[in-house]
């Protein structure tokens, strides 16, 4: 009987892995069709793509005022960009990252399925956990949990690694000698994703710190110190190797760079603690994820003797991991307070994005609660529930991966009803921009700069054209600590924010002769300052006329524009 069950489980494992691989392959094919050359993909990936393209083709960006600062971006390299650089030549760096990202999505399904199999043994419950973990859950600070929402970004690889760190941490509960190993690997995860690794380290440290029972005070203190050092050593090495060359903003320009940072991150960081409180409140009342997890935790602790051994071990880590997140927030608040009183920029704000780990901890608690009753449900019903959840998510899910997978399947099978209106809109916008970029390449002179009033970084990574700084470039401008570029970027952003036609003033007074804009409604007004080179439903491409350029140069010399 056991042999039959073993074979059935192995067959289920193989089937689920193949289905996950098929979904990820369809999502990749759909994404490559919806976003040719990466055009229109996630803006973080666009930023990485332009940095990689500038590194591979420096001559093409010799006149780009920002490209020389790209090496100062602390977000590059990361595991995603490093793996993308190893792929055989694709269309460009953007498509290479999309291919690596598809691997990340597949590993996400696989990692949480393995975690579920180790905790519960049941393939159906493991599949349920894997599906729950993939669901996109919005969080504060411009981040989210899950693998389905957008094009895969670097943090997905830490999410792939985290289940294995969690399993190793469970093993370390009974074998304390493994605790420093877990902490050391958590520190090494800085190479994967820095923000996640720092909050992950706090979670594991506090989880181990609370495991003091049956251990003398001094022995426990010594082990805790060793855990802390095991985590700190790789973190410090990472900071020294990868961030030591990042210049600090000059003290006399502290206010200038504070303004750059505030403007660049105004959308995600306008009110840090209120934003965090709002999202905690949202998942407490309108969407009761956290109350459900708390109830699950209470039931699990009450019935812990009925739990499987691995689940009982995981439950011992849970309180410490939640307290680790809280402790990480307290340390961030303290550092931010000190930075404000010392008149410098804080360094810990980004770590608060790691509070999103409250979501997977909640999913784990709810799935552990299900494990108490799962075996009492008829096998056919168990499998049916998992299949039903998967079908509902594939049918109703609005995440980019689901939309792309359905688009690819509709295209390959000739089933138009499978496609979505969102996919059709994404493709139409991407093709419209691709046509505009092709016209830009054909029309641009060898020494001409491009100006675009949106974050159209495809000018750099798809058309390989030098471009004036866009809003997203504020990040690297902040870390480059160049006062002149900071002033220039701020002036451009303020002029564009002043009114709907502010971008025209930037185009007329800056060095870029070419304008690529989505403001097709301003066509008549724009033709007063330049010649139309290309247009479609979404984009206009113009070259500034020499007369307008001379007039604006005279205005600038008179002091009016300044």
Q: Predicted regions span which residues?
A:
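Signature aromatic-anchored transmembrane alpha helix within multi-pass, membrane-resident enzymes
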Residues: 17, 229, 372-408
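Active-site lumenal/periplasmic loops and adjacent helix-entry segments of GT-C-fold
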Residues: 23-133, 140-163, 191-198
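Aromatic/acidic, Gly/Pro-rich catalytic loop(s) in extracytoplasmic/lumenal soluble domains
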Residues: 501-562
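Transmembrane alpha-helices and membrane-interface helical segments
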Residues: 110, 114, 164-171, 203-211, ...
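Start-transfer (signal-anchor) and selected internal transmembrane alpha helices
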Residues: 1-31
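Short periplasmic/luminal acceptor-recognition loop of GT-C membrane glycosyltransferases, typified by
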Residues: 423-494, 503-523
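Membrane-interface transmembrane helices that cradle and orient dolichyl/undecaprenyl
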Residues: 157-181, 215
């Amino acid at each position: 009987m056991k042999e039959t069950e073993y074979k059935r489980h192995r067959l289920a494992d193989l089937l689920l892995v193949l289905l996950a691989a098929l979904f990820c392959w369809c999502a990749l094919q759909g994404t490559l069709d919806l976003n040719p050359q990466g055009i229109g993909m996630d803006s973080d990936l666009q930023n990485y793509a332009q940095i990689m393209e500038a590194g591979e083709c420096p001559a093409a960006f010799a006149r780009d005022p920002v490209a020389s600062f790209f090496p100062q971006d602390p977000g590059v390299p990361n595991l995603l960009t490093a793996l993308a650089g190893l792929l055989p030549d694709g269309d460009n760096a953007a498509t290479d990252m999309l291919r690596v990202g598809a691997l990340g999505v597949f590993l996400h399904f696989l990692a949480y399925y393995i975690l579920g199999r180790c905790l519960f043994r049941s393939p159906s419950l493991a599949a349920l956990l894997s599906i729950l973990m993939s669901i996109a859950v919005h969080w504060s600070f411009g981040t989210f949990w899950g693998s389905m929402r957008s094009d895969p970004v670097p943090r997905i690889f830490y999410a792939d690694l985290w289940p294995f760190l969690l399993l190793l941490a469970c093993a370390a509960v009974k074998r304390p000698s493994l605790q420093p190993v877990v902490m050391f690997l958590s520190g090494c995860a800085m190479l994967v994703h820095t923000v996640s690794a720092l909050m992950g380290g706090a979670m594991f440290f506090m989880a181990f710190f609370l495991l003091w029972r049956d251990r003398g005070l001094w022995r426990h203190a010594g082990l805790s110190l060793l855990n802390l050092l095991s985590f700190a050593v790789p973190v410090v090495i990472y900071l020294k190797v990868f961030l030591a060359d990042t210049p600090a903003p000059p003290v006399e320009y502290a206010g200038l760079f504070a303004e750059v940072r505030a403007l660049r991150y105004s959308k995600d960081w306008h009110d840090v603690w209120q934003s965090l409180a709002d999202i905690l409140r949202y998942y407490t009342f309108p969407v009761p994820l956290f109350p459900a997890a708390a109830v699950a935790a209470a039931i699990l602790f009450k019935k812990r003797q009925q739990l499987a051994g691995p689940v009982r071990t995981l439950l011992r880590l849970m309180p410490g991991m939640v307290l680790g997140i809280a402790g990480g927030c307290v340390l961030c608040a303290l550092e931010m307070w000190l930075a404000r009183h010392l008149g410098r920029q804080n360094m810990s704000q980004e770590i608060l994005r790691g509070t999103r780990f409250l979501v997977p901890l909640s999913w784990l608690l709810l799935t552990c609660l299900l494990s108490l009753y799962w075996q009492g449900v008829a096998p056919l019903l168990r499998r049916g529930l998992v299949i039903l959840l998967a079908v509902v998510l594939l049918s109703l899910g609005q995440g980019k991966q689901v939309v792309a997978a359905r688009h690819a399947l509709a295209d390959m099978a000739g089933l138009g009803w499978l496609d979505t209106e969102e996919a059709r809109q994404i493709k139409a916008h991407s093709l419209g921009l691709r046509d505009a970029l092709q016209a830009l390449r054909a029309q641009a002179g060898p020494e001409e700069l491009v100006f675009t009033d949106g974050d159209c970084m495809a000018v750099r990574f798809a058309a390989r054209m030098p471009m004036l700084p866009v809003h997203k470039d504020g990040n690297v401008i902040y870390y480059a600590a160049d006062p002149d570029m900071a002033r220039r970027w701020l002036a451009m952003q303020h002029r564009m924010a002043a009114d709907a036609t502010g971008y025209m003033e930037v185009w007329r007074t800056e060095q870029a002769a070419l304008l690529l804009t989505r403001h097709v409604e301003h066509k008549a007004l724009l033709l007063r300052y330049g010649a139309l080179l290309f247009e479609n439903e979404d984009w206009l491409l113009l070259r500034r006329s020499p007369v307008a350029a001379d007039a604006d140069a005279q205005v600038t010399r008179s002091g009016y524009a300044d």
